[in-house]
């Protein structure tokens, strides 16, 4: 009895201390708290946008470097089987560097858990199956993306890939109940035009006469775009309906949630790609590829490591945009990066007839308009929240 009374007194004492010492956000006025929250949100969105642009640029530069070094030996004589080799390796590289994110996951501060714990075990189980299904989906996209670029003309592949944004818009409207505004629709239309005009050249595409049939090219491109669009919508659904409701991070959106999503999904995708690598006996070609690499084995390893790290930079930025804004916005930013990537590719490589032409310059200008249209919508939403808060405060005063 005495022990139970003592424990009750201790619990009451802790609760009273919690009331007397509230969180910093609770000390601030609601208006000031919302201003700080929106400022942090804008900083997070800007950081993720920069990571996507940086990751896209590094990935395409390193992919071009890799295939330029491999192209002379692997493409001298057309061999249909050679078109498939290396695709499981490239798919694995897209996901395998996730362990570098684990230290960052523990470095970022973890907010206090919410006191409510109802149905958290059920939600955690659903979250586990979401990570599992997303990992398989990302692995499928990685394989199709790597294969589609090698067996088809990159111009055709990129042209079909413009439908990716349309698929994302349709799926997010169905799965995420996304509400469109006229400015978002304008941003989508501009982004499609930008992607068509500003697509960079790719050193791994086959020479004339090497392409597969157009039906295979189209199906590979469509499958890759649908898998990517669906993964964005499911990631957004996981953030909104599952990860937030587990209350492990309180009621706030924190960057730690982004890292958790990427680590878990990339782990599953890496396992799937690793199984594919060994099941297809593609791992036996790695030693031969390193010897055929014109710059030598050291540069071969460094290029693969650089690619793996660049893919993680891109993935963290992309999932961050999905987390803080939406999957549709993440796809818009990803596709708007194409003119910047094209500029870097032109400066770094000497491809035949590949120049930063006037259409690409127009696409670069259009990128500002497309992102500006979407950012205007985000600004209006934040402004509306502030106006609603002011109105509620005025009603309380009255």
Curated annotation (Swiss-Prot):
PANTHER family in the record: OS09G0467300 PROTEIN-RELATED (PTHR31376), PURINE PERMEASE 17-RELATED (PTHR31376:SF34)
Membrane topology label: Multi-pass membrane protein
Species of the source: Arabidopsis thaliana
Residue numbers carrying Phosphoserine: 29
TM regions (residue ranges): 43-63, 88-108, 127-147, 155-175, 183-203, 219-239, 258-278, 301-321, 332-352, 355-375
Major localization class: membrane
Keyword Transmembrane helix: yes
Name of protein: Probable purine permease 17
Gene responsible for this protein: PUP17
Keywords: Membrane, Phosphoprotein, Transmembrane, Transmembrane helix, Transport
Localisation: Membrane
Compositional bias (Basic and acidic residues): 11-20
Gene Ontology CC: membrane
GO biological process, one term: purine nucleobase transport
Similarity annotation: Belongs to the purine permeases (TC 2.A.7.14) family.
Region annotation (Disordered) ranges: 1-26
Highest classification ranks of the organism: Eukaryota, Viridiplantae, Streptophyta, Embryophyta, Tracheophyta
Any GO MF annotation of the entry: purine nucleoside transmembrane transporter activity
Alphabetical list of InterPro entries matching this protein: PUP_plant (IPR030182)
């Amino acid at each position: 009895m005495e022990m139970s009374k003592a424990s009750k007194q201790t619990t009451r004492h802790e609760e009273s201390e919690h009331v007397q010492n509230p969180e910093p956000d609770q000390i601030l006025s609601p208006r000031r708290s919302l201003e700080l929250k929106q400022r942090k949100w804008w900083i997070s969105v800007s950081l993720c946008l920069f990571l996507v642009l940086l990751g896209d640029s590094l990935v395409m530069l390193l992919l071009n470097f890799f295939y330029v070094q491999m192209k002379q030996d692997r493409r001298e004589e057309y061999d249909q089987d050679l078109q498939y080799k290396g695709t499981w390796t490239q798919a694995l590289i897209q996901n395998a560097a996730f362990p570098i994110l684990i230290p960052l996951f523990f470095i970022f501060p973890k907010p206090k858990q919410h006191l409510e714990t109802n149905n958290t075990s059920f939600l955690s189980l659903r979250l586990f199956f979401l990570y599992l299904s997303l990992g398989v989906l990302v692995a499928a996209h990685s394989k199709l993306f790597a294969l589609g670029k090698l067996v088809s003309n990159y111009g055709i592949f990129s042209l079909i890939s413009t439908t990716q944004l349309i698929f994302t818009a349709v799926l997010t409207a169905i799965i995420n109940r996304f509400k469109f505004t006229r400015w978002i629709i304008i941003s989508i239309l501009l982004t499609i035009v930008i992607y068509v005009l500003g697509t960079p050249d790719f050193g791994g595409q086959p020479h004339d006469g090497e392409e597969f049939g157009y039906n295979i090219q189209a199906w590979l491109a469509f499958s890759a775009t649908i898998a990517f669009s669906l993964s964005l919508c499911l990631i957004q659904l996981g953030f909104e309906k599952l990860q937030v409701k587990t209350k492990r991070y309180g009621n706030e959106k924190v960057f730690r949630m982004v890292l958790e999503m990427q680590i878990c999904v990339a782990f599953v995708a890496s396992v799937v790609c690793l199984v594919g690598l060994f099941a297809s006996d593609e791992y036996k070609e790695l030693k031969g590829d390193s010897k055929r690499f014109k710059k030598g084995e050291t540069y071969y390893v460094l290029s693969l490591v650089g690619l793996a790290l660049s893919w993680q930079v891109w993935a963290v930025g992309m999932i961050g945009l999905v987390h803080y804004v939406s999957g549709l916005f993440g796809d818009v930013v990803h596709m708007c990066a194409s003119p910047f990537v094209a500029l870097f590719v032109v400066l770094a490589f000497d491809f035949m007839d590949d120049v930063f032409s006037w259409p690409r310059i127009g696409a670069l200008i259009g990128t500002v308009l497309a992102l500006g249209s979407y950012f205007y919508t985000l600004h209006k939403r934040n402004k509306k929240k502030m106006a609603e808060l002011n109105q509620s405060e005025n009603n309380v005063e009255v």
